[in-house]
């Protein structure tokens, strides 16, 4: 049956990393010690001094091009799904037209031990017959262990029409012995409740199986998610399907209210389900015979790494912690924090619990040679056996996943130091009716810094870096960059870094960035980057002479929006934090307020308008809008932002400003600083330097610009190069003539129609580089000052106060605030 997938199956292998472990638990007879080290005073001294420690074991498994997924454990043996090159069928004497032309990709079953020994199990599913214009293959979607010693694998045989993109999927459950002998094959025909309707209507349809478990009593349970959209209708379903393990006959179906996180088998033989009620995780026991659930407990955070363990134990990750849940008693115990064990968030998904109570997860690193995998084996260890290390304290507001990985890498590489993190976002209360509580974490961090409680390392992405630098709380990173053998200023985009400097000193890492700017038709805004407030006023006057209802930006942009944004852009023009002075009574600020006054007070959301009347590109072409706000995050964004203008000449002119060009750089991710009080600055630099190196910046390449010039040149080359589509198994997708199909680079919407983007041209790259070279402002925020300006300007906007009186009162209030911050 043909159906269009709303979720492309090309991401099945990658998405599987984010799903929970669906393997069976050790046998019920094994009762390992799986508990947190006791608190002081709760146990004898020899039992108290134990902490969870991680051991990182390289896994030698050649040819893998996918991470280890869907882990399952029996005793101390581990099983995983992966994928890679299973054959090279290059004909003798034939020179391939491209690398990999004759390589054969396929799914792989990996057997491993906690010591890093591994082997590929000798089962290779039969490949679909080759058809011109059709890309086909086989995926392993799920793996579980049967109590009789065999393995169950969920196979998905896919077929994708190269021209139409239409797909066909045929799933089967295959029971295997470890020697590759197929014991049972059960074609699955009854999982999709919406499939026939989707075929009739031609709507978007997808089906996935996020869980598989054997109850050991002749039944298999599958967790099924189904999505259908067509004919103006949207439907989705989450359910458990219980099948007879001999015949594949559907025995029971249980509809669920929320999204499925995992389905696992406990050591006692019972099946357990982890799912969501709204955004709250809940755990329940599954009765496959009756087809019902018994809810046991709930959790507080998004789930990762759900796995069955001995007896009635279920283990799961939530937030940074890993927990054990007694499904019989409903009692939960925290075992450890991943970060405390030097394990990154991205490495806490495919989790297994061994018979002796050790916890195993996986990590992988992509390289030109393929995927390098390692096992992360965690176990309670006597504290006396753990080498003591000096601790560097890091304070952050929202720890980004890539930063978490850098912390993990640093801690693993160091024998003398380790980093411990306090994420102040944990103190935010988004359920409070008081908006101040939403930023309680940031307020707490600022209060502690003022009081002298300064950590060794600080994420200053939401902090006033200039003021902290002026107070002598931060360390200049430039001397460290200059003396670093792998860096030096010649290796970095110093123009961008200089924009982030304060009085010639760089207090923060700037790894990746993008440009915030504006775009207008050249006939309206001119042909040059940058303009003054006077030039803007003239352009707006000319536009309104043609249409008095024309606006500066889109109809949604209000006065408060415009004033806030321009304040962030021009903060340094009006405030000198080092002197504790400001000049909001200047002529330049008066012009800014006059400019902002031209914006509407609010947008009328009840207005009867069409989508075309709201489209900023169409409004600019019709002379109803002067320019639009846009971001340049990659070279292809020139196309994305100009596609709707029909080839009309346009200019990335920027916001009107009295100094420089009215575009600004925005930092991406955590911006790290070394405090002046840090006693181990060389060790702190050993961590911070990672954010300037390729290994970190390459992770975001293509999405935002890097400051490392080697990574930047690589990004520029790839933006102009042709890349090709891959099939779900990793092989190249081919057209009817057997040629590789060019990969999509994204798309832009023009008047509601999707337009595919192409490779960037040399002219587009030169334009981006011209804009970057002309930009010297940085996005700078201060919520307290913003409120002073917004409240002070409101009477002027409402014709209740003159412009001169308005700026006088704003200057008076702002001067007091700025002086207090010195």
PLM features: residue spans?
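A structural signal for short loop-to-beta-strand junctions that line the ligand-binding cleft
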Residues: 210, 226, 446-447, 455-456, ...
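Conserved N-terminal structural module of periplasmic/extracytoplasmic solute-binding proteins
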Residues: 22-102, 110-116, 143, 156-158, ...
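Periplasmic solute-binding protein
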Residues: 468-478, 493-537, 556-579, 666-674, ...
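C-terminal capping/gating helix-and-loop segments adjacent to ligand/active sites or protein-protein/ligand interfaces
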Residues: 666, 729-814
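Extracytoplasmic "Venus flytrap"/periplasmic binding protein-like
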Residues: 422-492, 618-621, 626-627, 643-645
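Extracytoplasmic/periplasmic substrate-recognition and gating elements
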Residues: 642-726
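Glycine-centered hinge/linker elements that transmit conformational signals in sensory
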Residues: 579-613, 639, 648-656
């Amino acid at each position: 049956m043909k159906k269009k997938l709303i979720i492309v199956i090309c991401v099945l292998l990658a998405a599987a990393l984010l799903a929970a472990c669906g393997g069976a638990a050790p046998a019920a007879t094994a009762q390992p010690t799986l508990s947190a080290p006791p608190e002081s005073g709760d146990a004898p001294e020899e039992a108290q001094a134990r902490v969870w420690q991680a051991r990182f074991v390289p896994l030698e498994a050649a040819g893998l091009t996918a991470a280890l997924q869907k882990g399952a454990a029996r005793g101390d043996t581990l099983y995983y799904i992966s994928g890679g090159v299973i054959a090279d069928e290059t004909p003798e004497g034939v020179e391939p037209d491209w690398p990999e032309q004759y390589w054969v990709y396929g799914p792989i079953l990996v057997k491993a031990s906690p010591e890093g020994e591994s082997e590929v199990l000798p089962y290779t599913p039969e490949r679909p017959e080759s058809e011109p214009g059709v890309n086909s293959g086989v995926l392993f979607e799920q793996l579980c262990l049967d109590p009789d010693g065999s393995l169950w694998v969920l196979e998905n045989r896919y077929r994708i029409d190269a021209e139409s993109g239409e797909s066909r999927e045929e799933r089967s459950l295959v029971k295997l012995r470890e020697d590759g002998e197929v014991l049972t094959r059960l074609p699955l025909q009854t999982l999709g409740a919406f499939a026939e309707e989707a075929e009739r209507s031609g709507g978007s349809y997808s089906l996935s199986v996020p869980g598989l478990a054997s109850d050991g009593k002749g039944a298999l349970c599958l967790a099924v998610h189904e999505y259908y959209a067509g004919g103006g209708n949207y439907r989705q379903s989450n359910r458990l399907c219980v099948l007879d393990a001999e015949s594949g006959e559907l025995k029971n179906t249980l509809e669920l209210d929320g999204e499925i996180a995992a389905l696992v088998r406990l050591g006692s033989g019972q099946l357990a389900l982890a799912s969501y009620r709204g955004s709250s995780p809940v755990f329940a026991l599954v009765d496959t015979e009756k087809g019902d659930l018994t809810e046991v407990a709930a959790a507080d955070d998004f789930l990762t790494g759900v796995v069955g363990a001995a007896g009635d134990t279920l283990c799961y990750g939530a937030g940074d912690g890993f927990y054990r849940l007694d499904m019989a008693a409903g009692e939960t115990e925290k075992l450890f924090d991943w970060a405390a064990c030097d394990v990154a968030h991205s490495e806490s998904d495919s989790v297994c619990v061994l018979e002796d109570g050790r916890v195993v997860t996986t990590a992988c690193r992509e390289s030109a040679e393929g995927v390098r995998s390692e096992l992360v084996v965690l176990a309670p260890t006597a504290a006396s056996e753990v080498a003591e290390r000096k601790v560097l304290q890091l304070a952050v507001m929202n720890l980004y996943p890539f930063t978490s990985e850098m912390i993990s890498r640093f801690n693993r590489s160091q024998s003398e130091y380790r980093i411990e993190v306090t994420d102040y976002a944990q103190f935010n209360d988004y359920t409070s009716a008081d908006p101040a509580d939403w930023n309680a974490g940031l307020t707490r961090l600022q209060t502690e810094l003022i009081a002298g409680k300064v950590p060794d390392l600080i994420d200053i992405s939401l902090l006033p870096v200039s003021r902290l630098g002026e107070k002598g709380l931060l360390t200049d990173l430039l001397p460290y960059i200059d003396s670093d053998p792998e860096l030096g200023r010649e290796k970095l985009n110093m123009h961008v870094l200089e924009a982030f400097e304060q009085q010639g000193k760089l207090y923060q890492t700037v790894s990746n960035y993008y440009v915030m700017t504006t775009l207008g038709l050249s006939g309206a805004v001119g042909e040059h980057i940058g303009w003054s407030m006077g030039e803007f006023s003239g352009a707006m006057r000319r536009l309104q002479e043609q249409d008095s209802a024309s606006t500066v930006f889109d109809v949604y942009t209000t006065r408060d929006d415009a004033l806030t944004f321009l304040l962030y852009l021009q903060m340094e023009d009006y405030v000198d934090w080092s002197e504790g002075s400001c000049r909001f009574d200047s002529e330049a600020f008066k012009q800014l307020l006059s400019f902002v006054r031209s914006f509407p007070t609010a947008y009328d959301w009840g207005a009867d308008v069409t989508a075309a009347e709201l489209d900023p590109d169409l409004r600019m072409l019709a002379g109803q809008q002067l320019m639009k706000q846009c971001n340049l995050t990659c070279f292809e964004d020139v196309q994305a932002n100009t596609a709707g203008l029909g080839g009309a000449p346009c200019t990335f002119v920027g916001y009107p400003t009295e100094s420089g060009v009215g575009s600004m750089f925005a930092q991406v991710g955590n911006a790290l600083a070394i405090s002046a009080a840090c006693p181990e600055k060389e060790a702190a630099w050993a961590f911070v330097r990672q954010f300037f190196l390729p290994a970190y910046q390459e992770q975001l390449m293509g999405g935002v610009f890097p400051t490392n010039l080697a990574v930047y040149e690589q990004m520029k080359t790839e933006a102009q190069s042709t890349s090709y589509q891959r099939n779900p198994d990793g092989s190249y997708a081919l057209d009817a003539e057997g040629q590789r199909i060019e990969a999509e680079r994204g798309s832009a919407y023009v008047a509601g129609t999707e337009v595919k983007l192409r490779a960037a041209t040399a002219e587009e790259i030169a334009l981006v580089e011209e804009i970057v070279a002309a930009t010297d402002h940085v996005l700078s925020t201060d919520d307290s000052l913003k409120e002073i300006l917004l409240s002070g300007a409101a009477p002027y906007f409402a014709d209740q106060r003159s412009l001169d009186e308005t700026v006088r009162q704003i200057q008076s209030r702002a001067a007091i605030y700025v002086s207090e911050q010195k």
